[in-house]
């Protein structure tokens, strides 16, 4: 069986499933590898799916079922198994591998991954986080279009090496239809898929992709509120730490995996100690991306001080 070699989010991956969006490598060392393969789920899992159960989590094993797409089993921080449904949408099947499955792998490995896009600014990584619909991908796309380099679209995988670093993801972004229209992208030339009843498009960002880790300097949380103009405020102390924890990718599942252990919590503290955290509040139903970028460039880029 021919395997595809990838390096994504700091993970060495050998995959039976070809994922075109990932950067392919000729060779990869065999130790500490994540394998991705097609498989057949156990009778126990199949029985639970028949009973209507769609996800099951334990310390070292997570499986979940997506109707008409596939069943996925993620185990021991090093294995992803996929059983396809009949006539499955292969593009959507791979999206779950790229996002949720690798997110669960990182949780099992106690790697802190923050839900957000990552842009290189002033030679450092800046994470843009926030709730769904806050405008993360729109803002990171606008920054990329302005010439800033790009590390990751939706997941910021971190590593502590005295200070926190963000590991590169893959050189594509997922954009909704309105963002495609705002940036004048050709929808016909992009792969599309349906996610939560919304059409998403996969946009090539290879020309601005950064393939090496970058030191993390800022996290910016985007918030939509009933306000008239874009404002910015800094979070400090425990509020900063709490917001990091609240925005962990797939963090809602940590309590089902034995809770947050001391090592994982210490990584969150180390991130908080070494970065600044800002909240940008923007009005709903207005396209304020240019204003947000102006504010970020004027107020935040080049700021050296870290306030704990």
Where are these regions (language model features)?
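Long, basic/Gly/Ser/Thr-rich N-terminal segments
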Residues: 1-89, 93, 294-308
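Conserved lysine of the Walker
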Residues: 136
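Glycine-rich, often acidic-flanked micro-motifs
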Residues: 2-24, 122, 126-129, 146-151, ...
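Phosphate-binding P-loop
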Residues: 109-123
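Walker A (P-loop) phosphate-binding loop of P-loop NTPases
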Residues: 133
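Aromatic pocket-lining residues of Rossmann-like dinucleotide-binding sites
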Residues: 143
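Post-Walker A alpha-helix
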Residues: 139-140
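N-terminal pre-Walker A segment at the start of P-loop NTPase domains
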Residues: 95-112
């Amino acid at each position: 069986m021919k395997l595809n070699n990838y390096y994504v989010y700091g993970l060495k991956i050998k995959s039976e499933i070809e994922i075109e969006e990932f950067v392919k490598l000729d060779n990869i060392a065999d130790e500490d590898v994540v394998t991705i393969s097609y498989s057949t789920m156990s009778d126990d899992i199949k029985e639970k799916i028949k009973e209507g159960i769609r996800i099951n989590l334990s310390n070292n094993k997570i499986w979940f079922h997506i109707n008409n797409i596939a069943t996925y089993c993620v185990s021991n921080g090093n294995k992803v198994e996929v059983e396809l449904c009949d006539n499955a949408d292969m593009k959507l099947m791979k999206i779950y591998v790229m996002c949720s499955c690798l997110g669960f792998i990182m949780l099992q490995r106690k790697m802190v991954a923050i839900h957000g896009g990552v842009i290189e600014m002033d030679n450092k990584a800046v994470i843009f986080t926030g709730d769904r619909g806050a405008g993360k991908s729109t803002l990171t796309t606008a920054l990329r279009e302005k010439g800033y380099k790009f590390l990751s679209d939706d997941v910021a995988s971190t590593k502590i090496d005295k200070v926190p670093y963000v590991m590169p993801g893959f050189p594509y972004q997922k954009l909704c239809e309105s963002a495609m229209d705002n940036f004048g992208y050709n929808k016909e030339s992009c792969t599309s898929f349906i996610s939560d009843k919304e059409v998403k498009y996969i946009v090539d960002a290879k020309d601005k992709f950064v393939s090496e880790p970058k030191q993390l300097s800022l996290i910016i949380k985007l918030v939509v509120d009933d306000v008239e103009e874009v404002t910015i405020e800094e979070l400090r102390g425990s509020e900063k730490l709490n917001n990091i924890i609240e925005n962990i990718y797939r963090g809602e599942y940590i309590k089902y995996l034995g809770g947050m252990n001391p090592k994982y919590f210490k990584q969150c503290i180390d991130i908080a100690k070494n970065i600044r955290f800002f909240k940008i509040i923007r009005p709903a139903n207005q396209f304020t991306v240019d204003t947000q970028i102006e504010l970020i460039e004027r107020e935040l880029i080049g700021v050296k001080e870290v306030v704990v």
